[in-house]
């Protein structure tokens, strides 16, 4: 740590505030840890949302790319090696896990070697959206991924609706669905993003702002004889969960549940398919519909108590699933690292310089000022 370790710190207030701090504590890698000189870190809505999920009081940020400076005795990496990864969120986690700082300690979990053909900015934006899309498609929805030899139900020519294709998770889901063999791949996006969505692999794109969007999608499905039972809500808007709302405000939002992305996406499904056969996943818990299952970007051995989701499984059953699901995510990530040049177009990125600009970037992302754009902090200033 040859320079001041400037960081963006998340502390708990009713507004989920961040502030810039210089971290004084030295980071010394132990066991399988690696000390990383951070080049870039990716900004995500979770940088703010997690305070409303009772997670705070730590250095913010999850996605990172950088250079190994020191290693613990069990680290799989070498000094000077380029790596990237994503860290686990939890309340009062150690400062050394935060991505939005000059240096961090990377655990072995969800950390990968970065080959020369994968540039650091792409690497620093890959795992939050990509991992969530993988968990949704391969684990929650239960499909295989033939290109990587991941078993599961055959996705070939299975219709899928990805609501919110222009966001980070949506773009990843569209591209992975294309590689897996889903068809048709139907998505929603603002009108200005329709051409890009088709370039990424969507076969049909609808404007989610249109008052007739649900009927338009159903008309397409009926005209083609396609039966839709698979939905990936990649935005989960209008649910009122983890948005920093008061209890009264949350109830008011939930009273308008039929206007939420989750409700509208489900309304597009074949009405003749029973609930038990629907495959629905979302990026936030859907309290009003237990048929939706919340997807994450990784499945650690210790289950994260995030709350808000209705589940019929016991904790032991959940843990068994998570142990089976995490290797599937990692195998798909490894496939994507090797094949990203053919199958992956990263989100449009804008680099901000240092934690000062990064702090404003976090606020802009949370306020929804980005459209099909990912902000990345350059810590080499």
Swiss-Prot record:
Does Transferase show up as a keyword for this record? Answer: no
A molecular-function term among this protein's GO annotations: oxidoreductase activity, acting on NAD(P)H
In short, the EC number is: 1.-.-.-
Q: Where does NADP(+) bind?
A: 46-49, 166-169, 189-193, 208, 255-256, 370-371
- For this UniProt record, give its keywords in alphabetical order, as a comma-separated list: NADP, Nucleotide-binding, Oxidoreductase
Q: Specify the pathway.
A: Mycotoxin biosynthesis
Residues given in the record as substrate binding sites: 130-137
Residue ranges of region Substrate binding? 276-304
Source superkingdom: Eukaryota
| Gene3D superfamilies linked to this entry | Medium-chain alcohol dehydrogenases, catalytic domain, NAD(P)-binding Rossmann-like Domain
Keyword NADP included in the entry's annotation: yes
Q: Which Pfam families would you find in this protein's record?
A: ADH_N, ADH_zinc_N
Sum up the protein's function in the record's words: Trans-enoyl reductase; part of the gene cluster that mediates the biosynthesis of fusaridione A, a bright yellow trans-fused decalin-containing tetramic acid with antimicrobial activity. The PKS module of fsdS catalyzes the formation of the polyketide unit which is then conjugated to L-tyrosine by the condensation domain of the fsdS NRPS module. Activity of the Dieckmann cyclase domain (RED) results in release of the intermediate fusaridione A. The unstable pyrrolidinedione ring of fusaridione A is opened through a reverse-Dieckmann reaction to afford its ring-opened form.
Q: Which family does it belong to?
A: Belongs to the zinc-containing alcohol dehydrogenase family.
Assembly, per entry: Monomer.
Protein name as catalogued: Trans-enoyl reductase fsdC
**Which species expresses this protein natively?**
Fusarium heterosporum
Specify the taxonomic lineage: Eukaryota, Fungi, Dikarya, Ascomycota, Pezizomycotina
State the encoding gene: fsdC
């Amino acid at each position: 740590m040859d320079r001041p370790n400037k960081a963006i710190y998340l502390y708990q207030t009713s507004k989920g505030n961040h502030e810039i701090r210089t971290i004084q504590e030295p980071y010394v890698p132990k066991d399988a840890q690696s000390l990383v000189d951070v080049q870039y870190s990716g900004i995500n809505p979770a940088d703010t949302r997690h305070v409303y999920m009772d997670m705070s009081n730590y250095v913010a940020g999850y996605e990172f790319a950088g250079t190994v400076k020191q290693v613990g005795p069990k680290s799989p990496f070498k000094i000077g090696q380029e790596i990237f990864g994503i860290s686990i969120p939890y309340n009062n986690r150690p400062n050394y896990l935060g991505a939005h700082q000059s240096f961090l300690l990377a655990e072995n979990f969800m950390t990968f070697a970065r080959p020369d053909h994968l540039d650091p900015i792409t690497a620093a934006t890959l795992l939050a959206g990509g991992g969530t899309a993988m968990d949704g498609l391969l684990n929650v929805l239960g499909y295989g991924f033939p290109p990587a030899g991941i078993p599961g139900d055959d996705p070939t020519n299975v219709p899928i609706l990805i609501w919110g294709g222009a966001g980070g998770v949506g773009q990843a889901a569209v591209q992975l669905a294309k590689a897996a063999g889903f068809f048709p791949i139907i998505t929603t996006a603002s009108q200005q993003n329709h051409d890009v969505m088709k370039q990424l692999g969507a076969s049909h794109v609808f404007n989610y702002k249109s008052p007739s969007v649900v009927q338009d999608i159903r008309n397409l499905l009926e005209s083609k004889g396609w039966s839709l039972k698979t939905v990936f809500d990649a935005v989960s808007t209008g649910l009122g969960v983890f948005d920093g709302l008061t209890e009264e405000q949350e109830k008011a939002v939930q009273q308008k549940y039929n206007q939420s992305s989750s409700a509208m996406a489900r309304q597009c499904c074949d009405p003749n398919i029973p609930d038990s056969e629907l495959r629905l996943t979302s990026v936030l818990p859907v309290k009003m519909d237990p048929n939706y299952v919340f997807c994450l970007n990784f499945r650690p051995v210790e289950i994260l108590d995030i709350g808000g989701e209705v589940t019929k499984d016991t904790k032991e059953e959940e843990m068994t699933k998570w142990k089976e699901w995490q290797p599937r995510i990692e195998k798909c990530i490894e496939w994507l690292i090797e094949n990203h040049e053919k199958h992956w177009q990263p989100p449009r990125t804008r680099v901000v310089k240092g934690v000062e600009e990064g702090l404003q970037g976090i606020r802009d992302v949370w306020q929804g000022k980005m459209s099909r754009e990912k902000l990345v902090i350059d810590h080499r200033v």
